[in-house]
């Protein structure tokens, strides 16, 4: 276990932000009786709840380990961050898949690709052999993200538009939030401690991750749950071509 330094302030901000997001989504969904809407509320509430636990672990040092990289030099690995992403990014993908009415086979592919993306980043951050091997793992992770980009811009966007024009508009909004913010993660990673270059300070790196996480988890969820028409469309009898029927 390592003790966070000045970055602890941002880790606590992340913890509080995720707790507030969890409470907000839970209160919003409390009165919902529609099964499809409940599914959205449960998934969307779980996302910041998991992130809150991860940020609490990092803020208290439980989610951080110190690893030697060169001689006596050590680097702090925030493993709880990757545990968070490994659990929450598939939930975000499931939310998108529900809105789009994606096929089960497609959803399974996306979850596997997503896991490769996250684990590639974790593997790179733990490598001690130098910058080259870290960049290789960064490239693996980034390639997986590009494949996700292909599916979200292609098949899922088409399926969302086929459900209704409004569903297509809301899906595009959610997709753009997700992809736009996710595209910034590998940049922060390669410039920070993950890539081993340390171009940006640890505190700045943590701050950027907190801001990105709040946007992708709470911002995404707020936009989704404000789109009540899409939640209703998902439970419409004519929308049977979704992930529950394939």
Swiss-Prot record:
One of its GO terms (molecular function) is monoatomic ion channel activity. It holds the Pfam family Bac_rhodopsin. GO terms for cellular component: plasma membrane. It is found in: Cell membrane. InterPro entries: Arc/bac/fun_rhodopsins, Rhodopsin_retinal_BS. GO terms for biological process: phototransduction. Keywords: Cell membrane, Chromophore, Membrane, Photoreceptor protein, Receptor, Retinal protein, Sensory transduction, Transmembrane, Transmembrane helix. The record marks 84 as: Primary proton acceptor. Changing residue 211 to Y: Able to induce phototactic response in heterologous host. It is a multi-pass membrane protein. The covalent binding of retinal to the apoprotein, bacterioopsin, generates bacteriorhodopsin. The chain crosses the membrane at residues 7-27, 45-65, 82-102, 107-127, 135-155, 182-202, 205-225. The modification N6-(retinylidene)lysine is found at residue 217. Has no proton-pumping activity but is potentially capable of functioning as a sensory SRII-like protein. The chromophore contains 36.5% all-trans-, 7.6% 11-cis- and 56.4% 13-cis-retinal in the dark and 30.1% 11-cis- and 47.7% 13-cis-retinal upon illumination with >460 nm light. PANTHER family: BACTERIORHODOPSIN _OPSIN, NOPA (EUROFUNG) (PTHR28286:SF2), PTHR28286. Belongs to the archaeal/bacterial/fungal opsin family. This is Bacteriorhodopsin-II-like protein. It comes from Haloquadratum walsbyi (strain DSM 16790 / HBSQ001).
